[in-house]
């Protein structure tokens, strides 16, 4: 394995379900009418970060590590999954440089709690995580409010 940095991309999408708690970017968004459906808490930002880390390290994907066949992760927080993903990446011989995640959806508006979200995900990851948000201008499942998505990029460096 060369000592060159490696980059991975992760994507996660969840349906929004009325009455479900809205966990996004390691935070509970009180007052949201719907939250992401999922085996765990459905935190698309944390899940995309996990997938980006796994991809960068060549360790598979979120489903391989935390999928529905693993009952111990049912209802798990995205922060818990991200902390475990970071541990596995380090155990495989990598240091985490940083992770960047973009949340795609109409709600919640991540910009108003960006610093808090970055702190929560960075704490879980043990490395800097930047958080941004965007919409699809009313197009597609996120634009219609049917779902929420996230896209992440991670940089890891072999030790």
Curated annotation (Swiss-Prot):
Site entry (Transition state stabilizer), positions: 39, 135
Coiled-coil segments: none
Enzyme Commission number(s) from the entry: 4.6.1.12
GO molecular function list: 2-C-methyl-D-erythritol 2,4-cyclodiphosphate synthase activity; metal ion binding
Cofactor(s), by name: a divalent metal cation
Binding site for 4-CDP-2-C-methyl-D-erythritol 2-phosphate: 12-14, 39-40, 61-63, 134-137, 144
PROSITE patterns noted in UniProt: ISPF
Pfam annotation, one family: YgbB
Catalytic activities: 4-CDP-2-C-methyl-D-erythritol 2-phosphate = 2-C-methyl-D-erythritol 2,4-cyclic diphosphate + CMP
Binding residues annotated for a divalent metal cation, in chain numbering: 12, 14, 47
Cofactor note: Binds 1 divalent metal cation per subunit.
Keywords, in A-Z order: Isoprene biosynthesis, Lyase, Metal-binding
Enzyme class: lyase
Annotated metabolic or biological route of this protein: Isoprenoid biosynthesis; isopentenyl diphosphate biosynthesis via DXP pathway; isopentenyl diphosphate from 1-deoxy-D-xylulose 5-phosphate: step 4/6
Main function: Involved in the biosynthesis of isopentenyl diphosphate (IPP) and dimethylallyl diphosphate (DMAPP), two major building blocks of isoprenoid compounds. Catalyzes the conversion of 4-diphosphocytidyl-2-C-methyl-D-erythritol 2-phosphate (CDP-ME2P) to 2-C-methyl-D-erythritol 2,4-cyclodiphosphate (ME-CPP) with a corresponding release of cytidine 5-monophosphate (CMP).
Similarity-based family: Belongs to the IspF family.
Assembly, per entry: Homotrimer.
HAMAP family the record matches: IspF (MF_00107)
Official protein name in the record: 2-C-methyl-D-erythritol 2,4-cyclodiphosphate synthase
Lineage: Bacteria, Bacillati, Actinomycetota, Actinomycetes, Kineosporiales
């Amino acid at each position: 394995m060369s000592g060159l940095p490696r980059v991975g991309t992760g994507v996660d999408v969840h349906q929004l379900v009325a009455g479900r708690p809205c966990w996004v970017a390691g935070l509970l968004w009180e007052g949201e009418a719907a939250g992401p459906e999922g085996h765990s808490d459905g935190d698309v930002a944390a899940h995309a970060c996990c997938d980006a880390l796994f991809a960068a390290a060549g360790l598979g994907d979120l489903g391989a590590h935390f999928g529905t066949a693993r009952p111990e992760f049912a209802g798990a927080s995205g922060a818990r999954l991200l902390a475990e993903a970071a541990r596995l990446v380090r155990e495989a011989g990598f240091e985490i440089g940083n992770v960047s995640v973009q949340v795609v959806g109409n709600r919640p508006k991540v910009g108003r709690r960006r610093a808090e979200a970055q702190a929560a995900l960075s704490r879980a990851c043990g490395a800097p995580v930047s958080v941004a948000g965007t919409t699809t201008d009313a197009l597609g499942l996120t634009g219609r409010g049917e779902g929420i998505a996230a896209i992440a990029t991670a940089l890891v460096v072999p030790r």
